[in-house]
Amino acid sequence: MALNAIVLAAFAPAHTEPGVIDMYLFLNLLSLAIAAAGLAYAVNAFKQIMAKDAGDDLMQKIAKSVQDGAKAFLYAEYKWLAVFVAVVFVLLMVGTDNPANGQYLGYRTAIAFLLGCGASATAGYFGMHCATRAAVRTTQAAKTSLGGALDVAFKSGTVMGMTVVSMGLVGITLLFLLYGAPDQNKDAVNYINYVLGFSFGASSIALFARVGGGIFTKAADVGGDLVGKVEAGIPEDDPRNPATIADNVGDNVGDVAGMGADLFESYVGAIISTAIIGFSLVPGGLTGKDHEEALTSLLMYPVVLAAVGVVAS
């Protein structure tokens, strides 16, 4: 009981009814626990993939080249993205408060933006990290069993998928817990604007990761074809052609890390946009506890639905 009182005092606005707070906390903590279980599942699937045979020395050498190239590209991309994120973070901190018009975005929106950027980048990196290691193990498994190769490849995709949805759900529920249950005071007007920062952060990373990775992929593909096949007469995808490695690096950073960030942005955007629609559907005639219950129920509906989706997956 004492712990519950501390949690209520920490996360709930003073104007919110106790019953509404209990429901809000329960649904958020439940969704957070489900998201954590999804991340644990992704980590376990990754460990199962890493336990598979990685093939002979030549296979591992080629795979290592792709892994190092993908890691180097993401490191360079994220380094420049960090500058962009820092600039936008500062602008959100100092440039969006307007007390005269009842707008209080500032540091809360900036924190949500930073969390969205971090979650999106993490999901993309972890998915790419798994994919570059699963590819060689899928090839080795295909030497003995088609079903074994499918199992490794499918598990690799599962890691990316579960990481994306779980990271998105973790970020949103943490923000909801951090900012507390909405009530009828002025915070209710700006509440969803705070959380919009999370979607903005996810979209920012997705934009650069998807487009940047795609450009790199196409440049390596065209360059490898022109120089390798046309000029040197080396067959396509031959490991003797350095552009083949670059092409495979591009496939991973664009179609895995970039696509993962893109899917993360779409997933988070769908949840938050549904919550915004829910805010607009609250009947205007409701007051007091009835208004807060309707507000909280419609806000939490997309979050709980997403949590059910994680369980179903």
What is each model feature region?
Residues 3-313:
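Hydrophobic packing and interface segments
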